[in-house]
């Protein structure tokens, strides 16, 4: 399937997110099967953009359209890595500019009020798809990678990207 075909299948879920529903898009498969490519795509090749860049574009475009009828949205993003049973914030302070990881506060998964959250995980306000792309690049640069027998560029970790939308209608 092409990246466009894959996104066509998940696009209704992205719209549901803008409509106020919680949505999870999950890529699962064997090492080397294309999970990272499906989600991130190939930077610089418009036709090979992945689910995340296409979803961001759809969300920001829809938010701009809905502004005409009184809706405003605030977006924020976080990037969490799970590697060797440890949680790591892929966007420590200044990561966008420096491209370096620092030793963050201890991260742990918590459950409260029907929500799953990670205290101390940095959440960055995002205003457009290009800014999100830069943040994703910064997160990718500090992600754990190592060759395996199946894939010489394996990420060797699980990567959770979270986009939070808060929508309000003034009418």
Annotated model-derived regions:
Residues 35:
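Conserved lysine of the Walker
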Residues 1-30, 40-171:
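P-loop NTPase "switch/coupling" elements that transmit nucleotide state to mechanical/effector output
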């Amino acid at each position: 399937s092409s990246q466009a075909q894959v996104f066509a299948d998940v696009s209704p879920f992205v719209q549901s997110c803008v409509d106020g529903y919680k949505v999870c898009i999950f890529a699962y498969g064997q090492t080397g099967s294309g999970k990272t490519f499906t989600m991130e795509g190939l930077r610089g090749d418009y036709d090979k953009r992945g689910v995340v860049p296409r979803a961001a574009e759809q969300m920001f475009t829809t938010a701009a359209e809905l502004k005409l009828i009184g809706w405003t949205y605030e977006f924020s993003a976080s990037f969490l890595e799970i590697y060797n049973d440890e949680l790591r914030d892929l966007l420590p302070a200044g990561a966008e500019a420096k491209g370096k990881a620092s030793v963050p506060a201890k991260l742990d998964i918590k459950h409260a009020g029907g929500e799953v959250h990670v205290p101390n995980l940095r959440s960055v306000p995002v205003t457009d798809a290009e800014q999100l792309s830069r943040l994703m690049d910064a997160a990718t640069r500090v992600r754990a990678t190592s060759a395996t027998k199946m894939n010489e560029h394996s990420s060797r970790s699980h990567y959770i990207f979270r986009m939070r939308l808060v929508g309000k209608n003034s009418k």
